[in-house]
Structures are given as structure tokens and as C-alpha cells.
């Protein structure tokens, strides 16, 4: 659902930021 998709996007964004 939308909440899960939002959480996945947030997690991916956080991971991307950490890896920069």
C-alpha cells in the first residue's frame, strides 16, 4: 500500500545518502 511504498522510498533515499 501507499504507506509501505513511502517507507521503502524513505529507506532507499536514506541508504543512498549514506553511500554518497
From Swiss-Prot:
Quote the function comment for this protein: Pore-forming protein that forms cations-selective hydrophilic pores of around 1 nm and causes cardiac stimulation and cytolysis. Pore formation is a multi-step process that involves specific recognition of membrane sphingomyelin (but neither cholesterol nor phosphatidylcholine) using aromatic rich region and adjacent phosphocholine (POC) binding site, firm binding to the membrane (mainly driven by hydrophobic interactions) accompanied by the transfer of the N-terminal region to the lipid-water interface and finally pore formation after oligomerization of monomers.
Query: Which branch of life, at top level?
Result: Eukaryota
Name the UniProt record assigns to this protein: Cytolysin tenebrosin-A
From the UniProt record, give one GO term of the biological process aspect: killing of cells of another organism
Q: Which family does it belong to?
A: Belongs to the actinoporin family. Sea anemone subfamily.
This protein's GO CC annotations: extracellular region; membrane; nematocyst; other organism cell membrane
Q: How does this chain assemble?
A: Octamer or nonamer in membranes. Monomer in the soluble state.
Q: Where is this region: N-terminal region?
A: 11-20
Q: Where in the cell is it found?
A: Secreted; Nematocyst; Target cell membrane
What does the comment on domains in this protein's record state? Composed of a long N-terminal alpha-helix and a core region rich in beta-sheet structures. Before the pore formation, the alpha-helix binds the lipid membrane, partitions into the lipid-water interface and stabilizes the monomeric molecule on the membrane. Finally, it traverses the bilayer, thus forming the transmembrane pore.
User: Which residue intervals make up region (Plays an important role in the hemolytic activity)?
Assistant: 3-12
Q: Recite the UniProt keywords alphabetically.
A: Cytolysis, Ion transport, Membrane, Nematocyst, Secreted, Target cell membrane, Target membrane, Toxin, Transmembrane, Transport
- Give the organism, scientific name: Actinia tenebrosa
A GO molecular function term, named singly, is:
toxin activity
Task: List cystine links.
Answer: none
Amino acid at each position: 500500500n501507499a504507506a509501505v511504498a513511502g517507507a521503502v522510498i524513505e529507506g532507499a533515499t536514506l541508504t543512498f545518502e549514506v553511500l554518497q
